[in-house]
């Protein structure tokens, strides 16, 4: 029974997303840096952001975390380059608010996150949002 639930939660697609390590590893080149820990489960993430002219140019990260946090950080590190700092806090807050509802529809801008933001992973909400929370805190938004 427990194994079946585990298989349902962690899909091959989530593992594939998490295994993309193109932005893993800190370079000690950043305009903003933070380490954040999820007090509920112990997941930890450290981010390095390079920001210029109100745009995030790059995000590098290291985690000591579950596959959900790793997958979320991997996707976010690729997508974040398209985000404007002026709108990022509201966009992340709106995403968090709608994601609290099990019947939510993901905004098109975050469509790549649909494998993570679904009702099967609802109990991993804090793990999935740890990278988002870290970005907001690093930017002091």
Annotated model-derived regions:
Residues 2-141:
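Domain-level signature for proteins that mediate thiol-based redox and metal-cofactor handling
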